[in-house]
């Protein structure tokens, strides 16, 4: 299952998202990766626990979970805390699958079967950076408009092509 969800965020929300990301502190994305993914992950993520993270979650996740296509396609019971990632020139994320278990260690963990990527900037703002998802129909390459999202099985082998110029925000 691969489902593109258009217009999760409108222009006004995207503008607020970009301003919050501009104010945020980004850290090495490998800090949130599992042991296997650490070897292939080259990006930066917004530092968790920041004021910007809370505001972004209200904007982005609030819009996503209320979107009727997301409700129908993902049928979410529980939604993990998102990561806000930035890829600049030379950054990529090699082949990986998303962690099947989410939540804090020692309690509150749960299985995750659906992954979501929300595109936060326009595809012409960066070169490369395509999301490539392996499906039973072959590889699907996505570089969606700002504000659009895609959901796909967390068990799908996928990668992010190297960004050759500009900045990719998801």
Q: What are these regions, as identified by a protein language model?
A:
Residues 1-83, 170:
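Non-heme Fe(II)/2-oxoglutarate
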Residues 68-169:
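Catalytic core of non-heme Fe(II) oxygenases with the double-stranded beta-helix
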């Amino acid at each position: 299952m691969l489902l593109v969800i258009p217009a999760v965020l409108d222009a006004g929300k995207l503008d607020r998202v970009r301003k919050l990301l501009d104010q945020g502190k980004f850290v090495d994305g490998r800090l949130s990766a599992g042991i296997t993914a650490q070897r292939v992950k080259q990006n930066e993520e917004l530092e968790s626990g920041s004021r910007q993270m809370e505001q972004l979650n209200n904007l982005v996740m609030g819009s996503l979970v209320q979107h009727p296509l997301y409700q129908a396609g993902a049928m979410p019971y529980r939604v993990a805390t998102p990561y806000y990632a930035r890829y600049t020139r030379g950054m990529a994320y090699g082949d990986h699958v998303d962690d099947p278990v989410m939540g804090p260690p020692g309690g509150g963990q749960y299985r995750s079967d659906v992954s979501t990527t929300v595109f936060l900037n326009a595809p012409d703002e960066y070169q490369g950076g395509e999301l490539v998802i392996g499906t039973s129909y072959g590889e699907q390459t996505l570089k969606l408009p700002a504000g659009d999202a895609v959901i796909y099985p967390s068990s799908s082998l996928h990668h992010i092509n190297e960004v050759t110029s500009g900045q990719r925000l998801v």
